[in-house]
């Protein structure tokens, strides 16, 4: 489901610097790749080409803004399902067809499919989960958060590991 680990792939100093910038402070400018290029010593076209290459190599999975969905009125939940092997592809295809699915993982457990779902209201979340169950015949365990904890993780790429 995922590509090779980043440490298994060659990253030069330009790639590492670009990754640091886009993780922590993507420029909100009319020409962000020109700003990134200037910061790392490349042209705008070179910076953009490197970001595209990192995305193609699956080192960058997603490039976009993160919002506090709770403050915007959205609701989310962690979901789990016991999916028989013969229904796996059908179930995963149905789950992934919904724009509110933000993560979807296969686990070695009785509840073998785990995913998170976000919607504009709690009613919409529950309605969508009910719809998935009706279409697939597979019940979904709905585990809404009682309290939200956000942990920010930035993977510092342009550091000398020997400096620690």
Swiss-Prot record:
Q: Does the keyword Lyase apply?
A: yes
Q: Report quaternary structure and partners.
A: Forms a heterodimer composed of AhbA and AhbB.
Specify the enzyme's EC class, one word.
lyase
Q: Give the reaction(s) catalysed.
A: siroheme + 2 H(+) = 12,18-didecarboxysiroheme + 2 CO2
Q: Which family does it belong to?
A: Belongs to the Ahb/Nir family.
| Entry superkingdom | Bacteria
Q: Which residues form a coiled coil?
A: none
Record flagged with keyword Ribosomal protein = no
Q: What is its EC number?
A: 4.1.1.111
> In UniProt terms, what function does this protein have?
Involved in siroheme-dependent heme b biosynthesis. Catalyzes the decarboxylation of siroheme into didecarboxysiroheme.
- The gene designation is ahbA
**Protein name (Swiss-Prot/TrEMBL):** Siroheme decarboxylase alpha subunit
């Amino acid at each position: 489901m995922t590509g090779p680990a980043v440490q298994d792939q060659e990253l030069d100093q330009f790639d590492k610097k670009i990754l640091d910038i886009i993780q922590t402070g993507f420029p909100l400018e009319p020409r962000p790749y020109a700003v990134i290029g200037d910061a790392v010593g490349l042209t705008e076209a070179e910076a953009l080409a490197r970001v595209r290459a990192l995305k193609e190599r699956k080192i960058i999975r997603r490039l976009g803004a993160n919002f506090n969905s709770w403050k915007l009125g959205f609701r989310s939940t962690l979901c789990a399902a016991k999916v028989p092997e013969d229904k796996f592809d059908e179930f995963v295809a149905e789950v992934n067809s919904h724009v509110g699915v933000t993560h979807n993982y296969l686990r070695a457990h009785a509840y073998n499919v785990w995913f998170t779902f976000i919607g504009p209201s709690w009613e919409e979340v529950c309605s969508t989960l009910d719809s998935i169950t009706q279409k697939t015949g597979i019940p979904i365990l709905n585990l809404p958060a009682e309290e939200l904890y956000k942990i920010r993780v930035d993977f510092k790429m342009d550091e000398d590991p020997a400096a620690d």
